Amino acid sequence: MDSAPVLVTGATGKQGGATARALLAADIAVRALVRDPDTDRAKAIAALGVELVTGDLHDRDSVIRAAAGARAVFSVQMPGFTSDGDFDFDGEVAQGVNLIEGARAAGVPQFVHTSVTGAGQHLEHPRWSEGWAVGRSLGAKTAIQDHLRTAGFAHWTLLKPGFFMENFLPSMAFLFPRGLAGGLVSVLKPTTRLSLVAVPDIGAAAASAIADPARFDGVELELASEYLSMTQIAEVLSRVLGTPLTAPNLTEEAALAAGMPQMGATHEWMNVAGMPGRPEFARDLGIPLTGFEDWAREHLG
């Protein structure tokens, strides 16, 4: 077995953390790129046996140093904020490109990047030209994907996870902004079907790709753990919680008034375009998946 480590970005967050844990469970060494090794989150992953290296995705030289000797890189970026409080999607692209180019300069043979469902395909939709709130986000994700495809790695894989099951946690104040008693709040329509994904399944998919680079070479996996409508989701949550819930059927204005975060408006695109991820895509590759009801019973029951 290759004893070289995998450089994991975002290891103190959700997707990177899930990937680090999945790799460790497979006896694959993990090196995490962190900006500050003295934070509680960094210390927590170090306690699992993760090697910490200090760097910044805006500093390509630090990326090259961090990637030296790695067998693979796991890549995830989220936009920061500009000085006026807007999402910094240009910065997200810059980080992704720096990581790709830094890994190439360091001679890393494999690159596994997690993006988002439907990124790139959105440009082909007949209604895309109407303008949608999710436009800049999908544009940033697509730009990083395009750069990876032509970067020249010996092996590369794109993971395109769907709608996080974790968005249903009341602590997120996202789909339950008023708590469970306040019901589901969203612009998603009752018949809209979501390609749901549990965050640990993203880690499992990344670890599977890293363990078998040749099999996953060039794979662009639309990753879903389950594919359910909002009505079906409400039925599952009702069973688990023992509280009757109905799928919302709200306008954007009504949803915002009920507490939906502004970024929830981006979900209007899902009502129009749907989500391409299906569980069978991952199952065909041997990736273990988490059913939504099982997830809900573990986290909400």
Give, region by region, the residue ranges found by the protein language model.
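Oxidoreductase cofactor-interface core, primarily capturing Rossmann-like NAD(P)-dependent enzymes
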Residues: 2-44, 58-61, 65-72, 78-93, ...
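A hydrophobic C-terminal alpha-helical subdomain
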Residues: 22, 216-217, 240-241, 252-301
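Short, conserved active-site loop motifs that form the nucleotide-linked donor/cofactor pocket
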Residues: 49-50, 156
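Cofactor-binding loops of NAD(P)H-dependent oxidoreductases
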Residues: 55
